[in-house]
Structure formats: structure tokens, C-alpha cells
């Protein structure tokens, strides 16, 4: 089926009729939160915030991380997440990552073997921390 669709597209010369909107780069600007104008989308944390978060991470025995701190899928906005991964690695804490985006980022940046546990189940991880049980496991046990 896929080959048929592709062949039909080629036969109708749709490549020249279909248009897309794209961006080859997003401009990176640094600002403090109090000077962000309405309508501006914040996409990552900056160096000062990484430094601030690091103060809380260093010396912790256990860190549970759920959610990247920026849109780390884009190279221009991976700074915060990548640097938090490095701080977590160096902290010596037992680090538990919960959530698909955080897990994917840690693995993409080469940290998959540096943390105690990585789970793609963000909501399930939070549920387990809150309730000390998981709905799926409870159903199996019954």
C-alpha cells in the first residue's frame, strides 16, 4: 500500500504542488524571567538556572527527575537538559528518571548507564511515588 501511494504521488507530480512551513534554525536568546514579553515561548533554562538547580542537586542522596527542563529534542534548546544530566551524573546521588522525554534525552546524551533507574512511564512513576502502588500491578495481583 505504501509503495502504491508513493507511486501515485509521483504520477500526479504532487511534490511541486504541496507546500510546507519549516524553519532551519530557531534563534536563541537569553533573558531573565521578569523581562520576558507576553507571547514569548520559553524553550529552555539558561546557565544561571542550571547553576541554581545544581546547588539543590549536589549533596542530595536521591533525585527523582520527571520531565526535561527544555525542548531538548532541538539542538538549540538541549542546553538545560544536557547540563542537568551532567550535574546529576557528577552528584553521586541515586538518580531515578521517570518519563519518556527525560529518558530519551538521558539516553540520547549518553547517560543511560549513569543513573540508578530510567523509566519511560512518567505518569506511572509519579503514581508509584505518590501511592506506593501501580494500578497495572494491582490488577495482576488481584
Language model features with spans:
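Conserved catalytic alpha/beta core of Sir2/sirtuin-type deacylases, generalized to analogous enzyme cores
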Residues: 1-142
Amino acid at each position: 500500500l505504501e509503495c502504491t501511494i508513493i507511486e501515485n504521488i509521483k504520477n500526479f507530480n504532487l511534490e511541486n504542488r504541496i507546500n510546507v512551513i519549516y524553519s532551519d534554525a530557531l534563534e536563541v536568546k537569553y533573558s531573565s524571567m521578569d523581562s520576558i514579553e507576553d507571547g514569548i515561548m520559553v524553550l529552555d533554562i539558561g546557565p544561571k538556572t542550571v547553576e541554581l538547580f545544581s546547588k539543590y542537586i549536589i549533596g542530595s542522596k536521591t533525585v527523582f527527575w520527571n520531565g526535561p527542563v527544555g525542548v531538548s529534542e532541538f539542538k538549540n534548546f538541549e542546553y538545560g537538559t544536557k547540563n542537568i544530566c551532567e550535574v546529576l551524573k557528577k552528584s553521586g546521588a541515586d538518580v531515578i528518571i521517570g518519563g519518556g522525554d527525560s529518558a530519551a534525552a538521558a539516553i540520547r546524551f549518553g547517560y543511560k548507564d549513569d543513573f540508578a533507574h530510567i523509566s519511560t512511564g512518567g505518569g506511572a512513576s509519579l503514581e508509584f511515588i505518590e501511592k506506593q502502588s501501580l494500578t497495572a500491578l494491582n490488577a495482576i495481583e488481584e
